[in-house]
């Protein structure tokens, strides 16, 4: 995903309070709501870790969170 596209999607998810799933280039993943948007990073309230900053440059996959269906 290009940077401009990612910023638009992030802004949409932030504004609409959509729960997101983020995979990072360093192998971590996060599920939660975006609390804050800054110039180079966001703060997500991860379901397990609580408030966590994530650099935009470290985001590999950004998508709407979906519950597992068994």
Model-derived segments and spans:
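Short glycine-rich, low-complexity segments
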Residues: 1-29, 39, 45-70
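Structural detector for short beta-strands of small beta-barrel domains
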Residues: 30-34
């Amino acid at each position: 995903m290009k940077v401009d596209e990612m910023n638009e999607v992030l802004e949409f998810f932030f504004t609409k309070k959509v729960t997101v799933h983020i995979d990072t280039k360093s192998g971590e993943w996060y599920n939660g709501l975006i609390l804050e948007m800054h110039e180079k990073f966001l703060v997500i309230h991860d379901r397990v870790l609580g408030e966590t900053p994530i650099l935009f440059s470290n985001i590999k996959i950004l998508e709407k969170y979906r519950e597992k269906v068994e």
